[in-house]
């Protein structure tokens, strides 16, 4: 179990892990390591064909249960112990694969939500399983929270993503500008009242 990745890349999650049992904390850390590995493959600065090869190899190792890789072994252990659907993990792979193109262009709100579900809603769902959540409404909430966190990350990383030739919200510039103007007017009203 490597908490170092969690501590290095996800400080908030690392500190939150102290409030969990050791077993749950280890499972959360293993899930993080798996997701981080996929994310690192997608964000690698190598040439696209190398990234695609690394992604394909990791996915193949996952599907073939290549337990020579401890990250894959730990992920399969979580899938089995927490009854996580393999489809959820495949959805995660599909989402990450979206980022393995020369140009990433999300063209509709529906596509943006599907992408966000795949790369983050799935993680919320898997975390819920690890945390023993059984309430179906809470599971839906976990998916929605994952999507919301992804949309927040996309909004935060617009410039960085543009440098990587990824445009998730470019088609919504007018909507975003209008929303910001409305928010700013509401803000001004609040401080002047």
Predicted features along the sequence, with ranges:
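Acidic catalytic motifs of isoprenoid enzymes
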Residues: 1-193
């Amino acid at each position: 179990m490597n908490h170092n990745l969690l501590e290095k890349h996800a400080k908030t999650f690392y500190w939150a892990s102290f409030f969990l049992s050791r077993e749950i904390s280890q499972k959360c850390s293993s899930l993080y390591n798996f997701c981080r590995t996929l994310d690192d493959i997608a964000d690698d600065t190598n040439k696209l064909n190398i990234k695609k090869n690394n992604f394909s190899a990791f996915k193949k190792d996952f599907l073939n249960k290549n337990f020579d890789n401890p990250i894959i072994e730990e992920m399969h252990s979580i899938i089995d112990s927490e009854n996580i659907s393999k489809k959820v993990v495949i959805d995660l792979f599909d989402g990450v694969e979206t980022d393995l193109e020369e140009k990433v262009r999300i063209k509709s709100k529906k596509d943006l939500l599907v992408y966000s579900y795949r790369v983050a809603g799935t993680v919320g769902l898997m975390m819920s399983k690890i945390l023993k959540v059984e309430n179906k409404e809470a599971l839906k909430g976990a998916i929605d929270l994952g999507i919301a966190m992804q949309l927040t990350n996309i909004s935060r990383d617009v410039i960085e993503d543009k440098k990587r030739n990824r445009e998730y919200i470019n088609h919504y510039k007018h909507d975003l500008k209008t929303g910001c103007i409305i928010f700013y007017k509401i803000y001004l009203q609040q401080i002047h009242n």
